[in-house]
Amino acid sequence: MEMTDFELTSNSQSNLAIPTNFKSTLPPRKRAKTKEEKEQRRIERILRNRRAAHQSREKKRLHLQYLERKCSLLENLLNSVNLEKLADHEDALTCSHDAFVASLDEYRDFQSTRGASLDTRASSHSSSDTFTPSPLNCTMEPATLSPKSMRDSASDQETSWELQMFKTENVPESTTLPAVDNNNLFDAVASPLADPLCDDIAGNSLPFDNSIDLDNWRNPEAQSGLNSFELNDFFITS
């Protein structure tokens, strides 16, 4: 015969041993919140948020103060370094300025000494190049200083023409050119010194009138003599 559930539970409870320190009071069941509790919790939440915001702002303020102090320290350090560099630069500039002034003075002294040496050299050259007249007393006649007159030049020209006419008159009339054979023409030209006519020419005794100036193109006698020449006279016809 089957046993019911109630019987089974009753038998099991009778068989179980319940400890003495067993918690008989159970916790209360979750109940609904009242309006006062909700308002209190809202106020607590607002205060908690405000406290967190204040802490974050204070943290940022402290960090900003730290950064400002650090920046000021770095600026002071940089200014001190810049002042030292400026002092060093000023010292270097003063040294370079002094060196430049010294070199400039030296260059000016060199230019002045060079100009003085050039002036002395130029004066010495000019004194050596100047002409110093000799102390000898040279007396010159006034006749030598005066130019020749036209009359003296005309008289000299007449004497020269008379001398030329005298030379031409002394030439003998029997002097004739030697006959040159056509076959021995080269021998006669090759040995001109063997001909007695060449001796007369060397002695300024020409067979024609020497008074005619062939180079003077204004002389009508020279022009007529030049016009009388023909090209056929210079060629030998066979």
From Swiss-Prot:
Induction: By the unfolded protein response pathway. Accumulation of unfolded proteins in the ER leads to activation of IRE1, which initiates splicing of the untranslated HAC1 precursor mRNA to produce the mature form. Residues 1-39, 115-152 are annotated as: Disordered. It is found in: Nucleus. The keyword Nucleus applies. Residues 39-102 form the bZIP domain. Residues 67-74 are annotated as: Leucine-zipper. Residues 7-24 have a biased composition (Polar residues). Residues 41-61 are annotated as: Basic motif. GO terms for molecular function: DNA binding; DNA-binding transcription factor activity, RNA polymerase II-specific. CDD domains: bZIP_HAC1-like (cd14710). One of its GO terms (cellular component) is nucleus. Its main location: nucleus. Keywords: Activator, DNA-binding, Nucleus, Transcription, Transcription regulation, Unfolded protein response. One of its GO terms (biological process) is positive regulation of transcription by RNA polymerase II. It holds the Pfam family bZIP_2. Residues 117-134 have a biased composition (Low complexity). Transcriptional activator involved in the unfolded protein response (UPR) pathway. Recognizes and binds to the UPR element (UPRE) in the promoter of UPR-regulated genes such as KAR2, PDI1, EUG1 and FKB2. Increases the synthesis of endoplasmic reticulum-resident proteins required for protein folding as well as components of the secretory pathway. Belongs to the bZIP family. Present with 8970 molecules/cell in log phase SD medium. Homodimer. This is Transcriptional activator HAC1. The lineage of its organism: Eukaryota, Fungi, Dikarya, Ascomycota, Saccharomycotina.
